[in-house]
């Protein structure tokens, strides 16, 4: 998964993460059932706060793009044509 963060961007960092993951899901780059990096691993890779990545994942889950399995991780949800 490739995510680029820009401090020059007007959007908050969590929103940049949200948008890029959502676009990868919609394009099929992240297929349904695909495991996403853990919140901590993604935060470390992007050099951002765990709270920032947690918020992005929560927003993606609220929007129906992800689902979380406790103690297992976050996964891409099945495509819902009503979301697109």
Task: Give residue spans per PLM region.
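Short, mixed-charge, low-aromatic patches
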Residues: 9-16, 49-59, 72-73
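Residue-identity detector for threonine
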Residues: 19, 52-53, 68, 81
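Generic secondary-structure boundary/loop-capping signal
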Residues: 2, 27, 33, 47-48, ...
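N-terminal helix-turn-helix
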Residues: 36-67
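HTH-adjacent hinge/linker in prokaryotic transcriptional regulators
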Residues: 63-84
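Extreme N-terminal segment that seeds HTH/winged-HTH DNA-binding domains in transcriptional regulators
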Residues: 1-35, 41
């Amino acid at each position: 998964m490739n995510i680029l963060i820009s401090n020059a961007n007007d959007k908050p960092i969590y929103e940049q993460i949200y948008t890029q993951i959502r676009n990868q899901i919609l394009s099929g780059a992240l297929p349904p059932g695909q495991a996403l990096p853990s919140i901590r691993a993604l935060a470390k890779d992007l050099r951002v706060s765990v709270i920032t990545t947690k918020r992005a994942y929560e927003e993606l889950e609220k929007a129906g793009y992800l689902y979380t399995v406790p103690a297992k991780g976050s996964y891409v949800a099945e495509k819902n044509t009503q979301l697109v």
